Amino acid sequence: MDLSRIPAQPKAGLINVLIEIPAGSKNKYEFDKDMNCFALDRVLYSSVQYPYDYGFIPNTLADDGDPLDGMVIMDQPTFPGCVITARPIGMLEMIDGGDRDEKILCVPAKDPRYTYVKSINDLAGHRLDEIAEFFRSYKNLEKKVTEILGWKDVDAVLPLVEECVKNYK
């Protein structure tokens, strides 16, 4: 898979998210650049599972040295390697392993059920709480600590994506 062919921002206001982990999975897959395929990184130690499809924005480099993370709210899970053109609606800021780590929350651009969702404020607060709780607790049994800093709305996302695209280049 040639990731260089997948633009981070295919159109203004949209991003591409390459899915590594489908919703409902306890398996944490990661794209292995050396093998050029998806590989099982680990199985989550705790009883939680990924609430939505999770992956990364290709051709970006975040402060933690990895591509920028993205989570796409979907009604049905996709699969590792699926590229979803998505509309970012906000981001969860957290600390993971001592490093700042942002999780970009998105909705699929090609799903009419989410055309009204433009911001995290368009979602039920409980949904955001569930996502934050997942990231707060998913590493507990590994004796790793994550700290949730809070949610930022959509206006904070695109400048971060643009910065991470520049960092990659």
From Swiss-Prot:
- For this protein, the Enzyme Commission number is 3.6.1.1
Write out the GO biological process terms.
phosphate-containing compound metabolic process
Please give the InterPro entries that the UniProt record associates with this protein.
Answer: Pyrophosphatase, Pyrophosphatase_sf
PROSITE patterns recorded for this chain?
A: PPASE (PS00387)
GO molecular function annotation: inorganic diphosphate phosphatase activity; magnesium ion binding
Instruction: Show the CDD domains listed in the entry.
Output: pyrophosphatase
Q: Name one Pfam family in it.
A: Pyrophosphatase
UniProt binding sites for substrate: 28, 42, 54, 138
Q: Name one GO cellular component term.
A: cytoplasm
Activity regulation reads: Inhibited by ATP, but not by fructose 1,6-bisphosphate or 2-phosphoglycerate.
Compartment(s): Cytoplasm
Q: How does it assemble?
A: Homohexamer.
Into which family does the record put it?
A: Belongs to the PPase family.
Write down what this protein is called.
Inorganic pyrophosphatase
Q: Which organism is it from?
A: Synechocystis sp. (strain ATCC 27184 / PCC 6803 / Kazusa)
Its taxonomic placement starts with: Bacteria, Bacillati, Cyanobacteriota, Cyanophyceae, Synechococcales
